[in-house]
Amino acid sequence: MASEASVRLGVPPGRLWIQRPGIYEDEEGRTWVTVVVRFNPSRREWARASQGSRYEPSITVHLWQMAVHTRELLSSGQMPFSQLPAVWQLYPGRKYRAADSSFWEIADHGQIDSMEQLVLTYQPERKD
């Protein structure tokens, strides 16, 4: 029973492919679910301030490695998945390179209760 409750942490997944909005699969066939997407500044603040601006918000994504059942899936309109990449490839220096060539830093790779968690942060280049 102890082995079921503990998560064996090693290196982060080498690659994550989108399966459905908010759902990714790694090279070992494990499912990763997007549980938090945070924009800084918030999407509302960004919309107010961005008229005529090219500034992009930073994005932080929390992914949990967990089994997914079809009936539990959220529709794509329920969470802001449209700004997440279709593919993340592990890159040297604790970061992922996305399909659009953007870089996402690994802010955390650890355990929350019995779930393996991967936290990625995108910091856009300032275009002032």
Curated annotation (Swiss-Prot):
Role: Enhances the phosphorylation and activation of AKT1 and AKT2.
Originating organism: Homo sapiens
Protein name: T-cell leukemia/lymphoma protein 1B
Pfam families: TCL1_MTCP1 (PF01840)
Miscellaneous comment text of the record: Activated in chronic T-cell leukemias (T-CLL) carrying rearrangements of the 14q32.1 region.
Subunit annotation: Interacts with AKT1 and AKT2 (via PH domain). Does not interact with AKT3.
UniProt KW Transmembrane helix keyword: no
InterPro entries in the cross-refs: TCL1_MTCP1, TCL1_MTCP1_sf
GO molecular function, one term: protein kinase binding
Keywords for this protein: Chromosomal rearrangement, Proto-oncogene
The UniProt record lists the keyword Transmembrane: no
GO biological process, one term: intracellular signal transduction
Tissue expression notes: Expressed in a variety of tissues including placenta and testis.
UniProt record similarity statement: Belongs to the TCL1 family.
